[in-house]
C-alpha cells in the first residue's frame, strides 16, 4: 500500500530553556493508504498537539512530517489554508458545526469554498449523508439533533471532499456510550467501505481498539 503520512522524529516544545515543556519528544511513525490507526494516551500526553502539528494548525520544533511526498513543515503560511482544504478532513470532539447552517449546509461548506458546481455539491452531500445514515436530518440545524447525529454530520463533512487523510481528535469525547459506539462503527464503515484513511487520537481503550 502507498504511504500517505510519514512522521519523522518530530519534537514540540513550549516555553523557554528555563521552563521547557516537552509536548512531543521524538515521535516517528507511518500511515499507509486505507489504514485506520488509533493513538491512545492519557490527557496531557501530547495527542492533540500531535494532530495539530500534522494538520498544520501548530508547527513542530524539529523533525519533519510528510503527506505523500510533500514536507508539510515547509509549507508557507499563505498556502496552509488551501493545503488543509485540499488534503485533510477533520473530526473534532466538540463537532465544530456552524449553528446558523443546516446539517446539509455544514457538510457542503468545504465543497462550496472549493467552488465545486452546485449540482455536484448536492449529489455528493446526499450520497455521503445516506451512507452515514443522516439523510433524514439534512434540513435540520445542529441544535435540533443529537450529539451522535452532529458527529456523523462532522464525519460526512470530513470525507465529502475525498481528503487524503482524516484526522479525528477524541471524536467520542462528548458522546454517551451508545452514541460513541455508533460513531466508531461509522468511522469503521468509512474506512472499510469508503476507503477513508483515518488517524484518530483518544484516551479511550474502546475507541483505540477499533
Task: Outline where the language-model segments fall.
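Exposed loop/turn and edge beta-strand positions of beta-sandwich/beta-sheet ligand-binding modules
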Residues: 1
Amino acid at each position: 500500500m502507498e504511504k500517505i503520512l510519514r512522521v519523522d522524529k518530530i519534537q514540540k516544545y513550549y516555553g523557554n530553556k528555563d521552563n521547557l515543556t516537552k509536548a512531543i519528544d521524538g515521535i516517528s511513525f507511518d500511515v499507509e493508504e486505507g489504514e485506520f490507526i488509533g493513538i491512545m494516551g492519557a490527557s496531557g500526553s501530547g495527542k492533540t498537539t500531535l494532530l495539530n502539528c500534522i494538520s498544520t494548525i501548530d508547527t513542530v520544533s524539529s523533525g519533519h512530517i510528510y503527506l505523500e511526498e510533500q514536507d508539510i513543515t515547509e509549507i508557507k503560511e499563505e498556502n496552509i489554508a488551501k493545503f488543509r482544504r485540499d488534503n485533510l478532513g477533520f473530526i473534532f470532539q466538540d463537532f465544530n458545526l456552524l449553528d446558523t447552517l443546516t446539517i446539509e449546509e455544514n457538510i457542503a461548506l468545504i465543497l462550496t469554498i472549493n467552488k465545486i458546481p452546485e449540482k455536484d455539491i448536492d449529489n455528493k452531500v446526499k450520497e455521503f449523508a445516506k451512507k452515514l445514515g443522516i439523510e433524514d436530518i439534512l434540513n435540520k440545524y445542529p441544535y435540533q439533533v443529537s450529539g451522535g447525529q452532529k458527529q456523523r454530520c462532522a464525519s460526512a463533512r470530513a470525507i465529502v471532499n475525498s481528503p487524503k487523510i482524516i484526522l479525528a481528535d477524541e471524536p467520542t469525547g462528548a458522546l454517551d456510550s451508545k452514541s460513541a459506539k455508533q460513531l466508531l462503527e461509522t468511522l469503521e464503515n468509512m474506512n472499510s467501505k469508503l476507503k477513508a484513511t483515518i488517524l484518530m487520537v483518544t484516551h479511550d481503550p474502546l475507541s483505540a481498539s477499533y
